[in-house]
């Protein structure tokens, strides 16, 4: 299967900067303890002292008090790595000169994630239909259209297959998110150009 990002399954994402370079696996283990979030994923994001932390903890619950509870749990778990940063400093997203603490946070609910999945599916399907119609009108043979769409679909299938087979082994982030969908649409564009022009 594919490693679906927060955009597609729902969850909370936090971008945190630390005082020193930090091990993503150490933070993942720390936040995955039952008394913290139960499960979390941390990945190096940009510099070696910055992590992107994702969790599905209480994703179905909403409200300011839940968000506050989760930020406090995050802070309390990370405080040994924050070099004297107070909770107020940690959560202040308006400080542009912040050296340590929370830089960004957002939440995607499962409902929004389902909407994004559907929109992505329709975007890819729509592009294949447009390709089919363009070639049908341009070359006046449905067989050419079918062949071109099959070639484009084949190219997309190869990219999806490579992602599906290798995301666990790669040392970098290979999650399926909105940027991945944009990349798939780019593959469709290049494949179409190669099929029709060449």
Place the predicted regions along the sequence by residue.
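A structural signal for conserved, well-ordered secondary-structure elements
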Residues: 1-198
């Amino acid at each position: 299967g594919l490693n679906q990002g927060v955009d597609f399954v729902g969850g909370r994402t936090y971008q945190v900067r630390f005082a020193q370079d930090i091990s993503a696996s150490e933070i993942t283990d720390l936040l995955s303890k039952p008394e913290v979030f139960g499960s979390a994923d941390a990945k190096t994001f940009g510099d070696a002292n910055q992590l992107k932390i994702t969790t599905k903890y209480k994703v179905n619950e909403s409200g300011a008090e839940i968000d506050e509870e989760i930020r406090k749990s995050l802070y309390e778990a990370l405080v040994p790595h924050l070099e004297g940063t107070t909770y107020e400093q940690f959560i202040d997203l308006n400080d542009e000169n912040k050296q340590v603490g929370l830089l960004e946070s957002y939440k995607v609910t499962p409902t929004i994630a389902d909407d994004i999945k559907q929109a992505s599916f329709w975007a890819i399907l729509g592009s294949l239909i447009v390709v089919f119609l363009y070639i049908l009108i341009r070359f006046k043979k449905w067989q050419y259209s079918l062949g071109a769409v099959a070639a484009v679909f084949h190219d997309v299938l190869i990219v999806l297959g490579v992602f599906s087979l290798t995301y666990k082994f790669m040392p970098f982030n290979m999650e399926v998110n909105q940027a991945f969908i944009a990349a798939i649409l780019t593959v469709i564009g290049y494949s179409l150009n190669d099929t029709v022009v060449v």
